[in-house]
């Protein structure tokens, strides 16, 4: 029964994906639209193969992909360390939380894109502002989810652990962290997605290197199938990360 319940949504998702691809192919082939405006899925997947094999007008794909992946991983590492640290600080000290959390909420509400020129002026053009912008987008959700997860632990669990003679480290690692883990992991998953958005957006804003620069190159040169292919390959990075964190969430919930 449980297997059937988990299989049905998967079948529905795949059926929807196939329907979208078929409709997309039909529109691209028979709607009398220029290939410059819309590329068919068959052309896009063929272009992905060409890009991966190096036989395409898109220059230095692997070099630029390595730059983007490196920027994403670096930005995400900083996001996790900084976000978890701030979340721990806010949750462990009411004074720190009351003093600094409202300030962070104000920055969270600001459109981050207006801060990117400041990063360019401070860090110059290159990978550093891209990494910083990725951190800027991802750190808030990691911080708030970490803080919320640590604060939502039932007081009865803490009192029970204290009555059993647990010390502070044991209470944290055996009671608080397992109870907060699902919320924290959800924040880490969302933070990864925001980090990708930040890095790619920064690469598009100031074209230097990375997948964002290739997307810009394909756009200005009307390489529509290459543009679609690059967008799909960029999405694949996010999907892979989301799948990993979804697996971690299922493990922690169990």
Segments predicted by a language model, with ranges:
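Alpha-helical membrane-interface segments at transmembrane helix boundaries
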Residues: 62-74, 97, 104-107, 124, ...
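Transmembrane-helix boundary motif in ABC transporter permease subunits
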Residues: 74-104
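Transmembrane alpha-helices
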Residues: 132, 136, 168-202, 229, ...
């Amino acid at each position: 029964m449980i297997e059937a319940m988990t299989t049905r949504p998967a079948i529905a998702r795949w059926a929807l994906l196939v329907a979208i691809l078929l409709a997309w192919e039909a529109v691209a082939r028979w709607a009398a639209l220029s290939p410059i405006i819309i590329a068919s899925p068959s052309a896009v997947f063929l272009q992905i193969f060409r890009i991966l094999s190096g036989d395409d007008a898109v220059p230095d794909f692997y070099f630029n992909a390595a730059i983007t992946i490196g920027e994403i991983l670096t930005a995400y590492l900083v996001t996790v360390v900084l976000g978890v640290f701030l979340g721990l600080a806010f949750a462990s000290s009411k004074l720190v939380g009351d003093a600094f959390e409202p300030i962070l909420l104000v920055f969270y509400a600001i459109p981050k894109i207006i801060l990117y020129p400041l990063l360019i002026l401070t860090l110059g053009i290159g990978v550093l502002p891209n990494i910083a912008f990725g951190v800027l987008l991802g750190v808030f959700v990691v911080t708030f989810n970490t803080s919320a997860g640590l604060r939502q632990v039932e007081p009865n669990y803490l009192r029970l652990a204290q009555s059993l003679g647990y010390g502070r480290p044991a209470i944290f690692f055996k009671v608080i962290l397992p109870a907060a883990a699902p919320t924290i992991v959800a924040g880490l998953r969302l933070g990864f997605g925001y980090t990708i958005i930040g890095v790619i957006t920064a690469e598009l804003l100031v074209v230097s290197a990375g997948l964002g620069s290739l997307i810009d190159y394909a756009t200005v040169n009307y390489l529509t199938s290459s543009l679609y292919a690059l967008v799909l390959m960029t999405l694949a990075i996010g999907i892979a990360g989301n799948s990993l964190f979804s697996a971690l969430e299922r493990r922690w919930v169990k």
